[in-house]
Every structure is written in C-alpha cells, then in structure tokens.
Amino acid sequence: MDKYDKIIDLTKRRGFLWNSFEIYGGIAGFFDYGPLGAILKNNVINTWRKHYIVNEGFYEIDSPTVTPYEVLKASGHVENFTDPLVECKSCLESFRADHIIEENVDVDTEGKTLQELQEMIEKNNIKCPKCGGEFKEVSTFNLMFATSIGPGGKRAAFMRPETAQGIFIQFKRISQFFRNKLPFGAVQIGKAYRNEISPRQGVIRLREFTQAEGEFFIDSRKKENFEKFESVKEIVLPLLSGKNQENESLSAEEKIVRMSLSDAVKNGIIAHEAIAYYIAVTKKFLMEIGIDESKLRFRQHLPNEMAHYAADCWDAELYTDRYGWIECVGIADRTNYDLLAHMKNSSEDLSVFVELDEDKEIEVYEIELNYKLVGRTFKGDSKVLEESLKELDDKKMEELVEALETEGKYVLSTCKRDFELLKEYLTAKKVKKTVKGEKIIPHVIEPSYGIDRITYCVMEHAFKEDEDRTVMGFSNAVSPIKVGVFPLVNKEGMPEIAMDLKNKLRENGLIAEYDDSGAIGRRYMRMDEVGTPFCVTIDGETLTDSSVTIRERDSREQFRIPINEVVPYIKDKLN
C-alpha cells in the first residue's frame, strides 16, 4: 500500500471518509464525510471564516445552488466551462483526453487545443485502457449538470459550477450593505458541481464538492498601491512564474524561486499588490490548518490556460504522495469581467460611485430631446428612452453622436425595447461640468478554495508512521477530537471522575472523548490515529491528591497537573 491507500484505509476505519452510495456499488466522484471527517472539514471551513470574515472584514452570503441558464450564459460558463473528451469506438467508455495522454506519455497537455490533443493520441497510438479499442475524435464536453426549474422543463438551469456567481448577481445589494464604499469583500461557502468526465483520483476530483470563495471589489486604480500590502510584503514564498515554466533551459527545481512578495511585485512577476496580498492571506491560512510548508508552492497560470475571466491567476498547489502537485486554491484577478457581463445581459447598473480626491472639471454631453417627435414616435415608451439616454456612459454617448452625424440614425438597446433614433430626434452638445466623483465598474480579486482537496491534503500532511504507532498530527485548529479522557481502571470511582471531567471539557466548548476499553497504551494509540492532541488519565494518584496525567500526542510527554487546572490548561494550549 502506498501512502494514499494507507490514509484512505485509516479514514474509512475511523470515520473520516466513506464512499458515497456504497451499498449500491458507489459512484466515482462522490464521497461522504463520516463523523470525524465532517468535524475536520468544518474546522477547516471555520478557520477559513476566521481569516476572511474576522480578520479581513468580508461578510458571508448564502445563495441557491440551482442557477438559471441565463446567469451562466452571461458569465461565459455555457460556452467556456468545458473539458476535452474522447470516447472509445468499441466500449463507448469516456475519458478526459488530456488525462489519458498524460497517463501514457511524459508530456504536459495544459493549454493544448483539441487538434493538438488529437495529434498526440494518433502519434503515440494511445488506445482505450478498458478494452484496447480506438478513440473517436477529441471533442468538448460541458461540465455543468443541467436541470430545469418547475414542471415541463420550460426554465433551463444548471447546478452551479462555482459559488462566485451568486455574489456577482447580488452585487447591488452587497454594495448597498457596505454603503457603496469601495473596497469591500463578500464570501460564500457551499456546494458546487462539475460533471467530471472520468474522475479517477479519489477525493481529489469530485463531481460534488465544497468551495469557499471570496470576491474582493476594488477600484482598479487602487490595485497597484494596496494599503494592506505593507503588512505582508516581506513574506517569502516559493513562486513558479509563467515565464519560468516556459523556460526549457531550467530544471524543475530551478524554475521555482523563493522571493519576497515585494520583490515579486517589483519585478513584474505578480501583477500587482492586491493579488499579492491575498496570496499572503492564503499562505497564512494554509499554515494554520497544518499544511506542510515544504509541500506548498504558488504557480502562475500560463496565458493559454488562463480562465476566460482572468487577467492574472496564481494557484496554491499542494504536494501529494500519489498525485504530485495539485491545485487547491486559485487567486485570480477577474477584472470587471463578471459585473460587465451581468450588466450587459440584465440591463442593471452595477457601477459604484467613487469620490475623487479633488473636484474635477470634465466635458459631458447634454442631451435635448425633440419631445414632439419623440412622443409621436415612441408614445408611452418616451420616458424609458429619456432615462436610458441619461444612463449612457461617455463611450456609448460618443458612439451615439458619431452614428447620428455619419449615418443619421442609431439603435439604442434597452431592457424594454430597441429605439431607432434619427438625427432630428435630439441634439447633443458638450458642456463643461465640475464633478466630485464618478461611476466605475469595480474590479474583483478572487481567492477561491477547494475545501475537499485542502481537507485531504491536511490529512496526508498530518499522516505519520513509526515502529509502534500511526499518528494524524493535526494542527490544534482542525483536530476533530481535542481531548481523550481515560480512567486507568474501571473501578474505585475513576470512571465517574473521568466522565465528570469529560462533561466539563464539553461544557467549555471542547470535543472530548471518553474511553475505558483496553490497556492505556491501546487507548493512546486510538487517539493518536485520529489526531487527538491531548489525553488525560484518571489514576490512583487522582484519588489521593486530585492530580491527573496529561499526555501530549506529538512528544508523548506525560506530566501531572491538578484536575481543576485541566480545562484552562488545554484551552490555553489549543489557542
């Protein structure tokens, strides 16, 4: 058994992870969290909440997982959320084209076109691993689970592929909550769905998974000189830049460069201070939940693998024994792509008014309608036209004026109808105006976390074996059971004292487990295996001097303290 198999065996035995639908044969891409796994995962999430909600001042929302078609059409997911698919001509089994190539040839398929993938399959004579048959042509497969809303299937929808869109859709409400003052951030934690073609990587590649995403809305002019960056600029991180990835003269080790965030921004490796800051926040979070720092790196996306919405993106990748480096966090500059897309498709104004440092004199177009002609032509819709003209930005106004001058007409599209405007319907003249602010479409920095992958890596990085025990060396922040409480023997009042102590620990918010079965050494081993950092034993001395033995998991050190000091001692150590 390799390390992965040992961990999966332990997690199944001890109630961390179980195959979903197991009594019906199971389905690839789905896992259940058992009692200890659910606590572990929630501890990871709550630590994440501490970093983003408590420390960073974001607020959390909770939106539906079923998402109307038009939302994901506007966001680009209907067109772009795809993977390359190959299907066997003989057995009709489907596979990810890029994965099947990498399993047979030592080559990186990241960013390759469908044609390039097809050529690789043909050149290397790659066959179906199930039956040895030939593959059909490589095609694209949309990863979203399709569904419908209501009877009759009239309202097309999808299970959401990411939690982020719920935040963008509610941007106006969120902005009002923050009194329309940039910058501000919102987070959402919940299920997302991707209909993976052939998930064969256990808990690493799931069809239903938990995301924790933050959307930080900021004036694009503030990204370069981000106020909070000063506090993290000297943090040194292992960076794998896009430039180094493409430099074939460098070895794999040479491509990763350790440098401060300050130098990375200064040298143009990281786009700006705002994205660098959230890379630092990500590192702090991963360290607190027990990720091995030597198994962490930050890799920049290459241009040909960048998401359709991103201007720059860095992945926090964690090393695993079986699967190598896996992407667990993406920190992306989504620019104003999403807000612009939803503005265009919903006709809602998703801009924010920002005050200028000083008053500014600008030239703007002033529109004067020929109300007689407009009223005769558009009748009851004249008011809609007037309001729509007021909402036009400078670029659209320039476009309108130029079209009327050169072509004599212009079609203005609104959410209610299209207006075909003729030159005689209005006059537009430039006037000077003093303004105290302006409307902008905020840019978005998005830290997006795959909670399930992170939780698995927490388990793998915590897993240790020696001659006589297996240990899950969880950090205090995430360990599911905080204290094991044991009576040395089941007599002389020791069980009653132990049970009373367990109840006091629980009353103080600590999950404590009572165990009176087997030799004390076996009980320690059971607690080590599930990552419990402290064990307390009630023994003969407890009956005479009210002291107990505390045993620490990692050092195995044992010492005595008064029983009435156990709760404050452990709370202090855990914090």
From Swiss-Prot:
One of its GO terms (molecular function) is glycine-tRNA ligase activity. Gene3D superfamilies: 3.30.40.230, 3.30.720.200, Anticodon-binding domain (3.40.50.800), Bira Bifunctional Protein, Domain 2 (3.30.930.10). The keyword Oxidoreductase does not apply. Catalyzes the attachment of glycine to tRNA(Gly). The keyword Protein biosynthesis applies. ATP binds at residues 194-196, 204-209, 327-328, 450-453. Its EC number is 6.1.1.14. One of its GO terms (biological process) is glycyl-tRNA aminoacylation. Keywords: Aminoacyl-tRNA synthetase, ATP-binding, Cytoplasm, Ligase, Nucleotide-binding, Protein biosynthesis. One of its GO terms (cellular component) is cytoplasm. This is Glycine--tRNA ligase. CDD domains: GlyRS-like_core, GlyRS_anticodon. Belongs to the class-II aminoacyl-tRNA synthetase family. It comes from Methanococcus maripaludis (strain C5 / ATCC BAA-1333). It is an enzyme of class 6 (ligase). It catalyses: tRNA(Gly) + glycine + ATP = glycyl-tRNA(Gly) + AMP + diphosphate. It is found in: Cytoplasm. Pfam families: HGTP_anticodon, tRNA-synt_2b. The gene is glyS. Substrate binds at R96, E162, F209, T210, Q211, A212, E213, E446, P447, S448, Y449, G450. It comes from the Archaea. SUPFAM superfamilies: Class II aaRS ABD-related, Class II aaRS and biotin synthetases.
